[in-house]
Amino acid sequence: MRCLPVLIILLLLTASAPGVDVLPKTEDDVPLSSVYGNGKSILRGILRKGICCGVSFCYPC
């Protein structure tokens, strides 16, 4: 029962915290879609070069 007030206070603080969308954008901000796209293209390049990754769908070394 002693934890209930602490839980309620934490819920109230979480609900009143500003969201990520409220933060101002800077020039250094990079959209996440480009980060994920770069990761996919790097992975495609690794698989295309024939590097073994230990599973059957990879190209042979």
Curated annotation (Swiss-Prot):
<keyword id="KW-1015">Disulfide bond</keyword>
<feature type="disulfide bond">
    <location>
        <begin position="52"/>
        <end position="61"/>
    </location>
</feature>
<keyword id="KW-0379">Hydroxylation</keyword>
<dbReference type="GO" id="GO:0005576">
    <property type="term" value="C:extracellular region"/>
</dbReference>
<dbReference type="InterPro" id="IPR031565">
    <property type="entry name" value="T-conotoxin"/>
</dbReference>
<dbReference type="GO" id="GO:0090729">
    <property type="term" value="F:toxin activity"/>
</dbReference>
<keyword id="KW-0528">Neurotoxin</keyword>
<keyword id="KW-0800">Toxin</keyword>
<feature type="modified residue" description="4-hydroxyproline">
    <location>
        <position position="60"/>
    </location>
</feature>
<feature type="signal peptide">
    <location>
        <begin position="1"/>
        <end position="19"/>
    </location>
</feature>
<keyword id="KW-0964">Secreted</keyword>
<dbReference type="Pfam" id="PF16981">
    <property type="entry name" value="Chi-conotoxin"/>
</dbReference>
<feature type="disulfide bond">
    <location>
        <begin position="53"/>
        <end position="58"/>
    </location>
</feature>
<keyword id="KW-0732">Signal</keyword>
<comment type="similarity">
    <text>Belongs to the conotoxin T superfamily.</text>
</comment>
<comment type="function">
    <text>Chi-conotoxins inhibit the neuronal noradrenaline transporter (NET/SLC6A2). Induces flaccid paralysis, when injected intra-cerebroventricularly into mice.</text>
</comment>
<feature type="propeptide">
    <location>
        <begin position="20"/>
        <end position="49"/>
    </location>
</feature>
<protein>
    <recommendedName>
        <fullName>Chi-conotoxin CMrX</fullName>
    </recommendedName>
</protein>
